[in-house]
């Protein structure tokens, strides 16, 4: 059985979030939670929340055991980019892009489904 969770519009750039997601790809849930807890970044905190929600979905909806769950698939897609302006000296204006991400994590209790 498989359960997933999607967090859309996370306030973290996709490039920075992918570095943390690569650490836990294909690992079991307990190991992944330990790795994310010891990684001190905003992206790891958001990924940890999405992982905990995916595990809760698997336990509640499918009746799976938390100890058997493995991260079968996880990816980050770019979200909406907010464009903000910042005023500088001598009537100069610079544009700053605030990038967002869509974080998707799928957990499975079958080891064969995990890639």
Please place each PLM-identified region on the residue numbering.
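C-terminal structural segments of small proteins and small subunits
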Residues: 85, 91-102
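Short, flexible micro-motifs
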Residues: 29, 66, 82, 91-94
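Ribosome large-subunit tunnel/peptidyl-transferase-proximal elements
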Residues: 1-76, 98-115
